[in-house]
Amino acid sequence: MGVMEILVSTLEAVPGYRVAQVLGVVKGSTVRSKHLGKDLLAGLRTLVGGELPEYTEMLQEAREVAEARMLEEARRLGAHAVLGVRYATASVMQGAAEILVYGTAVRLEPARER
């Protein structure tokens, strides 16, 4: 038996389905910091401007970890979907950031046609 796929959406509804049960808010977070060497390289890049790929990569990885943690919580609840998903980022200390992802875990059923 495979892992149940859970729909993740910023929408509040899923076309063709209705929310049968609201299971509650689910969330996932992680705090990440950059390696000192990469931090120095990124600091040098700020002098000339442009994207800081070291931080872009770190934040992308952190979002993936936070989302996986949120989905694990949704899976434990038996959710079919997590709706209204939002991401938040906060600096927790010099060189470290928290990524938080949250939404509403729901069970869905096909919408009845009228």
UniProtKB/Swiss-Prot annotation:
PANTHER family: UPF0145 PROTEIN SCO3412, UPF0145 PROTEIN YBJQ. This is UPF0145 protein TT_C1581. It comes from the Bacteria. InterPro entries: UPF0145_dom_sf, UPF0145_YbjQ-like. Belongs to the UPF0145 family.
